Amino acid sequence: MTDRGDFAGQAALFTQDVVYDVSALGGGRLVGLATIREAALTLGDANPVAHHVTNIVLRETADGRVHAVSKGLGVMADGSTGSVTYEDTVERTPAGWRITHRVVRPRRTPLRD
């Protein structure tokens, strides 16, 4: 959805008041779908041309929410790539399951002993 600019479609993934924390990428905490849209449009050509999400692990919490951890791969227009970890809180809403909180953490250091 994001890659093709379908910002209205993001309501199928996120709550209207989602907290989208991209502080580790220098973007701060974005609150709400309108703020996420504006941030993406402000980035313009600096946006990835593709986002790929993989290795999704779900864990139900005692309060009925779901904690999701997944890997994200971003492909830039010049072909360079980056890797992040998404840490999501997912809650059941009247519209169905939606992400209420996301933290994006870049992976910049290789695994070492």
Language-model features: locations:
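A solvent-exposed, acidic/Ser-Thr-rich amphipathic alpha-helical stretch
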Residues: 7-72
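A beta-strand edge to alpha-helix "cap/lid" segment located at domain peripheries
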Residues: 43-113
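Residue-level detection of beta-strand scaffold positions
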Residues: 5, 10, 82-86
